[in-house]
Structure formats: C-alpha cells, structure tokens
A protein has these predicted regions:
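Short hydrophobic/aromatic beta-strand immediately N-terminal to the Walker A/P-loop
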Residues: 11-13
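Conserved nucleotide-sensing/catalytic segment adjacent to the nucleotide-binding pocket
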Residues: 36-110
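Conserved GTP-binding G-domain of TRAFAC-class P-loop NTPases and closely related GTPase folds
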Residues: 140-231
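P-loop (Walker A) phosphate-binding loop of NTP-binding proteins
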Residues: 17
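Hydrophobic positions on the alpha1 helix immediately C-terminal to the Walker A/P-loop
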Residues: 25
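Phosphate-binding P-loop
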Residues: 2-8, 87-88
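ATP-dependent NMP and nucleoside kinases share a basic, alpha-helical "lid"
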Residues: 99-151
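Conserved glycine(s) of the Walker
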Residues: 21
Length: 231
C-alpha cells in the first residue's frame, strides 16, 4: 500500500458494525504498529466510570450510565469531536473509531455522513486510511453484541443495530472512492479466520481482492459484493 509522504499527516478511520470487533483489531493488532491515539467516544465515557476489576460486574447505575444515558453519550461524542478539531488544527496524527452509520439524505439531495469528515481531512492535508471490519449479516452483529452484554460489555438496542447495518455498508461503499487508501477485513468466521483481509486499495486502485484470488466463503461475498462490488 502507498504510504503517506512526510508532508502529509496520517488519519485513520477505524469503522465497522457494532460487534464486528473493530476495537479488538486496533488494540490487539494495530495500536503498537501505528503508535497513535485512538479517539473513541465510548472509551471516553468509560473513563468517567468506576474501573472494572477482573470479572466483577459494574453496579447497575454505572451500566445504565454507559448504555442508556443519552445526555452523557452526547457529551462524550461532542468532546471527541472537539478533540478531533484540535488535532486537525494542530496537524496531529490520530485514529478515529466509529460505526460509520451516519447516512442522512438532506432536502437539497446531498447526504450528511462521515464522508464529510474524510473530505475535510484530505482538504487539511491528511493521508486518510479507512479500515473497515465487515460482517456477513445483521444477525451476526446482534449475536456478537448479545455475547458482549452477557460478558458485561456495552449494550446496543436491536432496533439501532438493524437500522445501522445497511447504512454503514452504504457509507463505506461511498467512502472507498474518497479516501487515499483502504483495507477491508472480514470477521464473520471462526477464531482462526479472524480479521481476514479481503480488499485493499490505494489511490483508487485495487491492490488486492480476495474474490480475484480464489473462491472466498459466501459469508465474505455476502457483504463485500455490497460494499466493494467488482466492475
């Protein structure tokens, strides 16, 4: 993949469906390689709550605060936006984690989405890399989130998961034509197939696509054909 020139700072958009494993991808496999801060509204909100020790569950009030307090969720999201604004103003390198599900058609026929952020970053001189973790279907997203909740993790309403899934796919499909480079991973399969790279592109040229390298599993093509259709 083409790397950013010294004159261009790096900005990484880490995105994926709820339960896709994007946080794990970053913290277990990528953080020590890139060595840059990851801006994440959920983690910022968690930093305001009591620390969890071992398998001990949070008290009920803390779980409600994390999962249901829309006021503080909004404060956390706006705080991350403020941090990002400052980072961009100072030309600091950073990564930003998001479900990337914002896709809102406007009355003037434009669409409000995170692609606006990508265009802003590129206009500010950043080399923008999109990392996306895909899942075969929304049922897998729902199942992963339920497992996470059972283990004491963050809850997301089923309705939101169902609404977000196709919007994320649509937004990523459009973003691929805007970013400088992108790597798409599949995380639909078993443990030994975790984070399979399935599509790599840079400067609007496809460098690798698993569909051209063989016969990928149907779980992969189920979403990859939607997000990055081959012409």
């Amino acid at each position: 993949m083409a790397l950013p020139q010294e004159s261009r700072q790096l900005a990484i958009i880490l995105c994926g469906h709820n339960g896709s494993g994007k946080s794990t991808l970053w913290h277990e496999f990528l953080a020590d390689h890139f060595k840059i801060p990851l801006l994440n509204a959920d983690r910022l909100l968690l930093s305001l709550l009591p620390e969890q020790h071992g398998s001990r569950l949070w008290p009920a009030w803390a779980q409600r605060f994390r999962d249901q307090d829309s006021l503080w969720m909004g404060i956390s999201q706006r705080s991350i936006t403020g941090l990002m604004d400052e980072a961009i103003a100072k030309q600091a390198t950073f990564a930003f984690e998001t479900v990337f599900s914002c896709w809102q058609p406007m009355p003037d026929r434009t669409v409000h989405s995170k692609i606006d952020l990508i265009q802003r970053l590129r206009s500010a001189g950043y080399f923008v890399v999109l990392l996306f973790v895909g899942l075969a279907d929304v049922g897998l997203s729902i199942g992963r989130v339920l497992t996470r909740v059972h283990e004491g993790g963050h809850k997301v309403a089923h309705r939101k998961l169902i609404e977000r899934f196709p919007r994320t796919q649509q937004a990523v499909a459009h973003a691929l034509g805007v970013v400088d480079a992108a790597i798409l991973f599949d995380n639909s399969g078993a443990l030994q197939q975790t984070y399979t790279p399935v599509h790599v592109r840079a400067n609007k040229q496809i460098l690798f696509d698993i569909r051209e390298a063989g016969s990928p599993a149907g779980a992969i093509t189920q979403w990859l054909d939607v997000v990055a259709p081959l012409s």
